[in-house]
Every structure is written in structure tokens, then in C-alpha cells.
């Protein structure tokens, strides 16, 4: 049976939300581990919250903290949605090699995004930028490896589910 997923339906949306949540969590755990291990601020949700504080947005610090976490997971979802399109359109196969390629590209995008964010907000967190960007690069590779593995597994489940159940 040759199954090609649609770009988006309810099953795919649920699949992408679950995958992005798990992959973003894996990336975040890696960043928190590196932060603790090297005693540096490598925590993306905390950095996003700090950027929001720097922007003088008129909401409470608790809201800024929650918004930082929310944005982190939304960005993770957007990355996974793009991967899904790449895989669904057969631009790349779902494979360890595509995970590595997408991880490298995502890492570069992540680094460029943080350089841009720090530049436009004039926020200078107390971290070694070179070390942070190296850690961020590898965090994105971990993110993409987890996303690819889960995508493959959930694709199998999706095929079986659609064969036997309808919503």
C-alpha cells in the first residue's frame, strides 16, 4: 500500500501537534541540561521571556514567562509543519539523512533568528554567544531527529488508524 499523506486534515494536525510538543520538549531538555552543565543561560523559553521584558510589553512578568513558553512551542510546531510539507510532497524522504539535513538547516535558521532578535531588541543576555549558538545548533538537530522518528512512527499509526477507523 503506497500511502501519501495529505497536506492537512484532522489526523495530520493531531499528529503534528503531538510530534512538535515532544520534539520541542526534547530540545528544551537538552538546552536545560546544557545550561545546568555549563552554568549558562541556554534556556530558549527563558530567553524569549527576557526578550519580552526587554520590549516593555505591558503585561505581567508571569504572562511574559507563559508567552515565552507558548511562543517556543508554536515555533516548534511551525518547524514540524514545514517538515511535514517537505515529506508529504516527497521533497525529502522521511529518513535519518533528511533529519540531519533539516536539523542543520533548522539550526542555522535558529541561530540567525536569535541574532536578529538580540539585535532588534538590544537585549544582551549574560551568555557566551558563540557557545550558545553552538548549543542551539545541536539542540535543533536533536529536535529534528526526534521529530523525524516520531513522524515515521505516527505515520505508521496513521495508516493503520485510517484503514480501520473514520471520524
Regions found by a protein language model. Name each.
Residues 2-167:
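Juxtamembrane/disordered regions of integral membrane proteins
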Amino acid at each position: 500500500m503506497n500511502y501519501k499523506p495529505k497536506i492537512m486534515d484532522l489526523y495530520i494536525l493531531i499528529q503534528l501537534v503531538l510530534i512538535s510538543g515532544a520534539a520541542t520538549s526534547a530540545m528544551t531538555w537538552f538546552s536545560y541540561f546544557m545550561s545546568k552543565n555549563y552554568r549558562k543561560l541556554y534556556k530558549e523559553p527563558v530567553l524569549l521571556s527576557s526578550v519580552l521584558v526587554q520590549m516593555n510589553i505591558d503585561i505581567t512578568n508571569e504572562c511574559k514567562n507563559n508567552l515565552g513558553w507558548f511562543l517556543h512551542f508554536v515555533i516548534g510546531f511551525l518547524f514540524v509543519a514545514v517538515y511535514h510539507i517537505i515529506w508529504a510532497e516527497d521533497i525529502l524522504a522521511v529518513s535519518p539523512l533528511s533529519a540531519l539535513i533539516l536539523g542543520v538547516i533548522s539550526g542555522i535558521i535558529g541561530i540567525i533568528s536569535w541574532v536578529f532578535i538580540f539585535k532588534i531588541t538590544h537585549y544582551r543576555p549574560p551568555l557566551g554567544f558563540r557557545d550558545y549558538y553552538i548549543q542551539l545548533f545541536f539542540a535543533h538537530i536533536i529536535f529534528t531527529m526526534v521529530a523525524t522518528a516520531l513522524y515515521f512512527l505516527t505515520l505508521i499509526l496513521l495508516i493503520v488508524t485510517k484503514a480501520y477507523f473514520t471520524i
